[in-house]
Amino acid sequence: MTVLVTGANGFVGGAVVACLARDSTTRVRAAVRRSSVTAAMTGDVVPVDELDMNTDWRQAVQGCHTVVHAAARVHMMQDGGRDSLTLYRAVNVGGTLALARQAAAAGARRFVFLSSIKVNGESTSARRPFRADDAPAPVDPYGVSKAEAEDGLRTLGLLLGLEVVIIRPVLVYGPGVKANFDAMLRWVQRGVPLPFALVRNCRSLVALDNLVDLVRCVITHPAAQGQTFLVSDGDDVSTAELLRRCARAMDTKARLLPVPLALLRTGARLLGRGAAAQRLLGDLQVDISPTRERLGWTPVVTMPDALRQTAMALRARRRP
């Protein structure tokens, strides 16, 4: 069975390629942007141009049974406004649907789409976690574009006989993670005092290994067809507890200061960082019980173990 993985040189896509390559019954084809191709890349690597509605995927999808679509215009904190939504739609909607059409035309049977929990919204309340069957409530351009891509894929699936499977991950962390999570780890490692001792929120995260294992599962699982799955570690934590766990993973102690939440929110608002504060102070939980029950799937790594692996990778990157 040949599986095409897009975004194969990215954080998630690269891990999916590595996982599937360990299965002797699966031939992995890695699609990467033409500008990212290097001489060090080996195996079945297919270069593609910029992702949009005009991308030519014919070489990449030829002979593929399944497509795992991990390539996307990713969420950036500073993105916003109408022009931003246009850019997100071009890649995440137009590019995704063009790939699905060409894959179906080439005879692909299944299309696994890496979406985002942002389709559900930005936060939960009253300890009521998001569910896959909740009405979509995206807030930012990235979430809107992912929701529209999901709708388009469901329609194409019905029209073209393509088995569409959608996965909505929460924040993904693991060895090689970048951006805010990487910055947080470095703050903890350096002993930077952080004002989150009083934060008692509840947030779901997913280790890279757990997300990748779910992708592996839905590629062939008969009960995955036409379904949407939420995924997390099944171990929700507060920001304060997450920082403590990160510190333990790095054999240090988190320096947390007891700053009142109202003061944190006010300060963030005055600095124009309200959205960032919500991610640190607010709740975002997901219910993965339907994922577990329908697929017989369970997370393969615990959060403490995944954080230790992430910390080890961070230390390895810092060595000369």
Predicted regions and their residues:
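N-terminal Rossmann NAD(P)H-binding glycine-rich loop of SDR-like oxidoreductase domains
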Residues: V3-D23
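Conserved C-terminal active-site "lid" loop/helix of NAD(P)H-dependent oxidoreductases
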Residues: L208, E241, G267-T298, Q309
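Mid/C-terminal beta-alpha module of Rossmann-like enzyme folds, strongest
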Residues: C217-A275, P304, R308-A311, R317-P320
